[in-house]
Amino acid sequence: QPCLVPDTSPLGQLQGGTNMIVLEGDAVGQIVLRGAGAGAGPTASAVLSDICDIARVYRGTVFGEPAKTLKAATPALSQRPAAYYLRMSLKDKPGALAKVAAVLGEAGVSIDRMRQYGHVNDCAPVLIVTHKTTRADIDHALAAFGATSVVDGDPVALRIEEV
């Protein structure tokens, strides 16, 4: 699922064809693995590695256990609270912003920041950053926006990861 990351985080500072994985653990803190991820060399290396694994009928193990028997103990992404970036176009009507705030409040979503830009064709782009909430609450609000007469088109919602 696409998301936004702070530009001050290791992931936010990536440039070019570099790939990165950020791992966090209680005992070790943050571990960052970074390496080439695009271009002729890295792609050829990955393809060759896959061909070798297929030829060897590789069935890898993790910590001495078959990888397919390991169970993930993490909650579904939709259940992990996070801040969200919302972008929508509001019709130029009295009470439009109040209606948006009411819909978010009814869905259990709290607004951290909001910004409205100049009008274009009787509509104004509005950007909202929420406090931490679940994707289910965001989806509830998005569905409710469709029933209002103040939101023009489909709003966009992107998760903001803290890494």
Segments (PLM) and residue ranges:
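C-terminal substrate-binding/catalytic lobe of Rossmann-fold NAD(P)-dependent oxidoreductases
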Residues: 1-18
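Glycine-rich phosphate/pyrophosphate-binding beta-alpha loops
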Residues: 5-7, 29-31, 35-41
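A short, polar/proline- and glycine-enriched secondary-structure boundary/capping micro-motif
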Residues: 10-11, 42-46
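A conserved regulatory-domain signal marking ACT and ACT-like small-molecule sensing domains
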Residues: 46, 51-163
